[in-house]
């Protein structure tokens, strides 16, 4: 195993009520740790909404803790989430970008507010159900902690964890990093967890699965505007620029509009390609591989390097969205951010999303695409 768990002390496990964090708590108890399960409530604006699953998730987490015999506690981080994550989320959408709140939520809530709270409970480590790994290495600068991809490539979550620092990683355990999801479900069934078949959570971090347009409208003023082609032809009206992202095909409302057609009468689909905030216009292009959707370079800022120092210039690999295959690239970093040049043009590189850099299985860090 990459991550050797030697010192058996107190570890606080973030328990969400899902199968991953439940199995994490059980595994650590089996390894001899004093486990405390902690449920984090991070959203309370609409607790009575049909989309809010917090109550059931809390009951699921408490039930698992009781079954496996670990202490269980509850903490409310709703204020911290709103100030540190949600406010940034709204600012980014207002600026025409498409943020990834899961990245900031991990850095500010799960591995900062949660870590601080766990330390106040006398914990030596925290643990979560993320699919990633931590490795301690000896260097000329002393012991350093590397963030590695999970063994299960289909579930690897290192992309969302790239903003973690050395202090956070030194206190963090990821027991599921060495397992495949099928093994986790099997363990859950074998030990009799009632949530063994519970589906994985999706949607905005901690806010859940709810109609995005309806949700965003509650917090962000939006105005309709024209949908235009690169030539300036008006095709329709958008509902507000915040509701669209680069490369979006569904939900444009122009499905019946014909553009350039082939000899057989068929035509390529329309894709969202650019936002003009000044004129409140959404530009769309026809065809998945339209030049407006392809980029062979990018610039990122608001950077975090896991090691604390920028990597040397050279050849690496990068992801510009979750579940994307690693793309070979050249890195040039400076004090304000970094530039990437890709061997092959990347599709729909989206401002506000994270560009995350890798050296093999090692996640080096990343920044926000501008």
From Swiss-Prot:
Region ranges (Interaction with target base in tRNA): 100-102
GO CC, one annotated term: cytoplasm
Family as reported in the entry's similarity comment: Belongs to the MnmA/TRMU family.
Catalytic residues in the record: 105, 205
Subcellular location: Cytoplasm
Function comment: Catalyzes the 2-thiolation of uridine at the wobble position (U34) of tRNA, leading to the formation of s(2)U34.
InterPro entries: MnmA-like, MnmA-like_C, MnmA-like_central, MnmA-like_central_sf, Rossmann-like_a/b/a_fold
Enzyme Commission code: 2.8.1.13
Binding site for ATP: 14-21, 40, 129
One Gene Ontology biological process: tRNA wobble position uridine thiolation
Positions bearing the site annotation: Interaction with tRNA: 130, 353
Keywords assigned: ATP-binding, Cytoplasm, Disulfide bond, Nucleotide-binding, RNA-binding, Transferase, tRNA processing, tRNA-binding
Gene3D superfamilies referenced in this protein's UniProt entry, alphabetically: Adenine nucleotide alpha hydrolases-like domains (2.30.30.280), HUPs (3.40.50.620), Translation factors (2.40.30.10)
Region (Interaction with tRNA): 155-157, 321-322
Example of a GO MF term: ATP binding
Enzyme class, UniProt record, top EC level: transferase
S-S bridge residues: 105-205
Catalysed reactions, semicolon-separated: S-sulfanyl-L-cysteinyl-[protein] + uridine(34) in tRNA + AH2 + ATP = 2-thiouridine(34) in tRNA + L-cysteinyl-[protein] + A + AMP + diphosphate + H(+)
Primary location class: cytoplasm
Protein name: tRNA-specific 2-thiouridylase MnmA
